[in-house]
């Protein structure tokens, strides 16, 4: 007997339940007929530990319309209406970060399902201060490595604070995965110290004892692992840094942010001191940069790099320059007929950006930029808008961007980007270089709609005619050539196990099946070899179709086994 959940445990809800039940009987004939026509089917299966493959008892299996706890053998039985639904499986001690659930098409002749839960990974941090004082209320930030536009970056995972024992806990971690853990800078005292005064505090430390992320080591955890991390924070002097300049057009001082060379912001921003006519900050030894930025009709940006080495830093002058838009020319080479299935992914209002007119030409694509100069932080959008007053329907401009080197990712609403260059540089191979004032060579983009298709089957399939089952795999077509386009992907449901990738740019691909969407660092040769080892190579011609057969995903393994 399965322990079924009682949705109306509270006696106070009995009357409400009766009203709802009664209301369900008061319906007009067409509605009642539709209700009677809805068929309910049994959905059975088992929940297993992804590491040990042992059954998990008392796991919650929630099918939206019905929910139940698994028995001692990990088995469950739901009664769900026909059609698509989502089944979510949870259990304390197992990761809750396994996506949004299992998509199941409910119908007749359903097979028994096997759902896996990943044992929760955790990291316990223990902090010691060099002074021997209590290490309570020390703030830490954890970063997880993500692949943005095919390039690895450290993105913030969460923030943690030590307790009275100097301990912090990171729970429910995605595993297997790697994490970078860094403490925040902390200073003693408050207010404005007298000139020449040296403050003391604890500089940031990244596991296992590095001064900044660039020299830190990632801590890798596996499913179910309970890892430990030891930190020793050393009390050091913080020296005064004064930065002049950085004023707006109206003469008002601009806010100045200070970062280490990885791009990670310092805990304390520079403070404006009227009596000095400059901004002031206190920093430990290290390499930094300060930046100031204004967004709006008159955008401006300035940056200055500096180092602190056993003494105060004076005479820094941060100069800001106006930012300018970057010209973008978009050429569309569309054919009248497209057998490759160039799907329109967007249809609606103009995507030119805030303040644009609805009757202005639409660029038909979006751009995102991710910095090649910093290893920390998010990718940013790069709004395109039609050049105001231009009669050329293909003349656009990229909104003001700060100086630096950026990898470009393109998202075409129709067709695909076949080429993108800036000053003759192929942006699929090299980053976009934006100089002082946001200056860059014009960007030239060509969009085509003669993409091909990749069709195929995962595994040997199931008996012909079966159209029901669970989302069992993700298919990724990993480009074996430089591109700024998103990686073609598709979900494969149980049943006949077929898939179709539409609007695929011509070129060679490695087709792989996995349990979740792939994150790939194209600059990591070992990772590329690991991810593509179990796949099949195909070449897609313009407007052509390629068919492949991919081995089924091994449960709990995460990728195809070919």
Predicted regions and their residues:
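Extracellular beta-sheet/turn segments enriched in Thr/Pro/Gly and aliphatic residues
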Residues: 35-37, 102-124, 211-235, 305-323, ...
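A short, solvent-exposed loop/turn motif at the edges and junctions
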Residues: 85-103, 180-216, 292-303, 401, ...
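A short, amphipathic beta-strand motif
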Residues: 41-49, 74, 123-129, 231, ...
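Short, acidic Ser/Thr/Gly-rich low-complexity loop/linker segments typical of extracellular
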Residues: 65-79, 148-171, 262-278, 372-397, ...
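Short, ordered, surface-exposed loop/turn motifs in non-cytosolic proteins
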Residues: 41-43, 48-65, 82, 129-150, ...
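Periplasm-facing N-terminal accessory domains of Gram-negative outer-membrane beta-barrel systems
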Residues: 35-138, 145-149, 169-172
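Bacterial N-terminal signal peptides
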Residues: 15-29
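Short Pro-Gly-centered beta-turn/loop motif in secreted/extracellular proteins
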Residues: 54, 77-84, 169-180, 185-186, ...
């Amino acid at each position: 007997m399965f322990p079924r959940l009682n949705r109306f445990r509270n006696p106070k809800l009995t009357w409400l339940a009766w009203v709802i039940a009664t209301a369900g009987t008061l319906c007009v004939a067409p509605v009642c007929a539709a209700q009677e026509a809805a068929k309910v089917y049994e959905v059975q299966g088992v929940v297993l530990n992804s590491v040990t493959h042992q059954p998990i008892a008392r796991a919650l299996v929630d099918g939206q319309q019905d929910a139940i706890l698994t028995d001692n053998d990990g088995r469950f039985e739901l009664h769900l209406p026909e059609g698509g639904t989502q089944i979510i499986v949870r259990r304390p001690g197992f990761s809750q970060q396994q996506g949004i659930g299992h998509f199941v098409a409910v119908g007749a002749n359903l097979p028994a399902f096997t759902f896996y839960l990943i044992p929760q990974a955790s990291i316990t941090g223990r902090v010691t201060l060099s002074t021997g004082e209590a290490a309570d209320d020390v703030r830490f930030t954890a970063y997880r490595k993500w692949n943005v536009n095919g390039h690895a970056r450290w993105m913030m995972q969460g923030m943690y604070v030590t307790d009275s024992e100097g301990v912090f806990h990171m729970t429910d971690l995605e595993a297997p995965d790697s994490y970078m853990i860094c403490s925040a800078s902390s200073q003693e005292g408050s207010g404005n110290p007298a000139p020449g005064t040296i403050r003391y505090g604890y500089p940031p430390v990244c596991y296992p004892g590095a001064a900044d992320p660039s020299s830190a080591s990632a801590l890798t955890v596996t499913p179910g692992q309970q890892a430990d991390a030891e930190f020793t924070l050393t009390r050091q002097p913080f020296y005064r840094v004064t930065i002049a300049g950085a004023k707006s057009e109206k003469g008002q001082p601009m806010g100045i942010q200070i970062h280490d060379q990885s791009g990670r912001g310092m805990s304390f921003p520079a403070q404006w001191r009227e009596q000095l006519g400059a901004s002031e900050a206190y920093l430990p030894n290290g390499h930094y940069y300060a930046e100031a930025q204004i967004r709006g009709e008159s955008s401006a940006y300035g940056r200055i790099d500096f180092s602190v080495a056993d003494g105060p830093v004076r005479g820094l002058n941060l100069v800001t320059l106006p930012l300018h838009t970057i010209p973008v020319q978009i050429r569309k080479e569309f054919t009248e007929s497209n057998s490759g299935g160039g799907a329109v992914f967007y249809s609606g209002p103009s995507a030119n950006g805030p303040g644009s007119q609805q009757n202005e030409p639409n660029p038909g694509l979006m751009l995102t930029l991710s910095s090649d100069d910093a290893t920390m932080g998010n990718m940013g959008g790069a709004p395109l808008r039609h050049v105001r007053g231009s009669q050329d329907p293909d003349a656009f401009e990229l909104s003001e961007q700060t100086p630096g080197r950026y990898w470009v990712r393109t998202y075409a609403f129709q067709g695909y980007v076949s080429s993108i260059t800036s000053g003759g540089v192929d942006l699929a191979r090299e980053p976009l270089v934006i100089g002082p004032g946001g200056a860059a060579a014009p960007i030239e983009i060509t969009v085509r709609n003669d993409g091909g298709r990749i069709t195929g089957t995962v595994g040997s399939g199931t008996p012909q005619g079966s159209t029901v089952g669970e989302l069992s795999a993700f298919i990724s077509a990993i480009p074996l050539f430089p591109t700024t386009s998103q990686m073609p992907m598709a979900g494969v449901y149980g049943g006949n196990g077929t898939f179709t990738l539409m609007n695929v740019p011509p070129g060679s691909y490695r087709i792989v099946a996995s349990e979740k969407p792939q994150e790939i660092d194209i600059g990591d040769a070992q990772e590329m070899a690991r991810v593509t080892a179990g796949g099949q190579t195909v070449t897609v011609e313009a407007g052509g179709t390629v068919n492949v057969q991919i081995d089924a995903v091994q449960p709990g393994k995460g990728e195809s086994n070919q």
